[in-house]
């Protein structure tokens, strides 16, 4: 059974009042999370930190933020108390508020997080998902609140774009999750967690949450460069995957300026169908997309592009489609992830039969491409691929019952 914790409903009134006061103060103070080294130097200079100290202070702060995972200046014991007070008076470390935490029966976590407004209107809510696996743990990170792409099979696409997330908000999803899972030195893991104590919990990041990362290029770039910085979070760029639906002009730039692994939401082998499934194809058709993929910087057998392909019954799952997919990807070092369609209320598609998915995969495998079938994770908490949607647009009870009915047979076989 999935476990759900609604944090905002269980807090006492005094805590709510205190949190509101803190949030009001945070709206007025600059966050240091998400700043580059040089930007942090400038921020410290602006409050009067002596010039000869700024680089040292930045190194200290970087270590506390990204190696130790602290969320309070008071925890930074190697910084003098007067300096800590100066930092507290001028800056913030504003971790998001947990609105709801859900834990799937398969161990997947989904968090609904609320970020303060910070001058951007009302507070916004986004969803972040953690997927534990054998020898690894993957965090699925959002880049936007909502999405503009309206892919017809994707639940997230039914939520209109509210705004882009900042580099701070993208990074804070990772910092929050590592703290929550006890993944920083000296941090306790949750009482209800079954996660191993012996290894790093979050080994991989995938930019596959809410939104199109390449429509928020600068913030995503900044966040991922900080996440991969060797003096901080130190995630290998080989373990960070940026997923795009095909924003062709930014693909080459992403390879040159960010240098992480690339995934492409493909889902169709001809323009006429992809125009329906992934409407951005009308602007950047398959010929343009494939050309950009062939020219992706660093592309090699060791740095393959992952192509995501959702399996839709009687839509894109024929063996002829599989053969056309092989032809389409010819010459591109690639892996093809086959994704069983995850149902959601109001969707008009069905998942391909399992036997058909296996036959499809076999055709691709025989052509020399790896084509793993992605086992659905977190379906019972709407954390599976294509299911994310912030709870500012929560499911009505009738919709949730409909979803449970739709998924009943599938869940029993996983």
UniProtKB/Swiss-Prot annotation:
GO cellular component: cytoplasm
GO BP term, example: rRNA base methylation
Residues that hold [4Fe-4S] cluster according to the record: 147, 151, 154
Sequence positions that bind S-adenosyl-L-methionine: 211-212, 243, 265-267, 342
Catalytic activity: adenosine(2503) in 23S rRNA + 2 reduced [2Fe-2S]-[ferredoxin] + 2 S-adenosyl-L-methionine = 2-methyladenosine(2503) in 23S rRNA + 5'-deoxyadenosine + L-methionine + 2 oxidized [2Fe-2S]-[ferredoxin] + S-adenosyl-L-homocysteine; adenosine(37) in tRNA + 2 reduced [2Fe-2S]-[ferredoxin] + 2 S-adenosyl-L-methionine = 2-methyladenosine(37) in tRNA + 5'-deoxyadenosine + L-methionine + 2 oxidized [2Fe-2S]-[ferredoxin] + S-adenosyl-L-homocysteine
Key words of the record: 4Fe-4S, Cytoplasm, Disulfide bond, Iron, Iron-sulfur, Metal-binding, Methyltransferase, rRNA processing, S-adenosyl-L-methionine, Transferase, tRNA processing
EC supergroup of this enzyme: transferase
InterPro entries cross-referenced by the UniProt entry: Aldolase_TIM (IPR013785), Methyltransferase_A (IPR040072), RlmN_N (IPR048641), RNA_MTrfase_RlmN (IPR027492), rRNA_lsu_MTrfase_RlmN/Cfr (IPR004383), rSAM (IPR007197)
Co-factor note (free text): Binds 1 [4Fe-4S] cluster. The cluster is coordinated with 3 cysteines and an exchangeable S-adenosyl-L-methionine.
Family according to the record: Belongs to the radical SAM superfamily. RlmN family.
Additional remarks: Reaction proceeds by a ping-pong mechanism involving intermediate methylation of a conserved cysteine residue.
Protein name per its UniProtKB record: Dual-specificity RNA methyltransferase RlmN
Organism this protein belongs to: Bartonella bacilliformis (strain ATCC 35685 / KC583 / Herrer 020/F12,63)
Originating gene: rlmN
């Amino acid at each position: 059974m999935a476990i759900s914790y609604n944090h905002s409903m269980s807090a006492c009134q005094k805590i709510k009042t205190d949190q509101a006061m803190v949030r009001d103060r945070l709206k007025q103070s600059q966050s240091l999370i998400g700043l580059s080294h040089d930007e942090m130097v400038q921020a410290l200079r602006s409050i009067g930190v002596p010039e000869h100290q700024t680089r040292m202070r930045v190194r200290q702060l970087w270590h506390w933020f990204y190696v130790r995972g602290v969320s309070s200046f008071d925890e930074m014991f190697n910084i003098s108390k007067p300096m800590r007070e100066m930092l507290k008076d001028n800056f913030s470390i504003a971790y998001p508020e947990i609105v709801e935490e859900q834990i799937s029966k398969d161990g997947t976590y989904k968090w609904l997080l609320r970020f303060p407004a910070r001058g951007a209107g009302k507070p916004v809510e986004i969803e972040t998902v953690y997927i534990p696996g054998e020898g690894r743990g993957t965090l699925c990170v959002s880049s936007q609140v909502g999405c503009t792409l309206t892919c017809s099979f994707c639940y997230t696409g039914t939520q209109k774009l509210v705004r882009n997330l900042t580099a701070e908000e993208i990074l804070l999803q990772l910092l929050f999750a590592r703290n929550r899972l006890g993944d920083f030195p000296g941090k306790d893991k949750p009482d209800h967690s079954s996660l191993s104590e012996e290894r790093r919990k979050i080994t991989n990041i995938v930019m596959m949450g809410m939104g199109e990362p390449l429509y928020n290029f600068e913030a995503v770039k900044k966040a991922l460069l900080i996440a991969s910085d060797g003096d901080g979070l130190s995630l290998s760029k080989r373990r960070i995957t940026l997923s795009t639906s095909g924003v062709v002009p930014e693909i080459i730039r992403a390879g040159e300026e960010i240098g992480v692994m690339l995934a492409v939401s493909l889902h169709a082998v001809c323009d006429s169908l992809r125009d329906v499934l992934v409407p951005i194809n009308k602007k950047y058709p398959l010929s343009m997309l494939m050309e950009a993929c062939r020219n992706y910087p660093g592309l090699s057998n060791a740095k393959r592009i992952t192509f995501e392909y959702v399996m839709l019954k009687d839509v894109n799952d024929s063996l002829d489609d599989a053969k056309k997919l092989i032809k389409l990807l010819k010459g591109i070092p690639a892996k093809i992830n086959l994704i069983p369609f995850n149902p959601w209320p109001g969707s008009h598609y069905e998942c391909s039969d399992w036997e058909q998915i296996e036959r499809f995969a076999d055709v691709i495998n025989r052509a020399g491409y790896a084509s793993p079938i992605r086992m659905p994770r977190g379906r019972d908490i709407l954390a599976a691929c294509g299911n994310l949607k912030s709870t500012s647009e929560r499911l009505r009870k009738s919709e949730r019952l409909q979803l449970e009915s739709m998924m009943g047979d599938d869940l029993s076989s996983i």
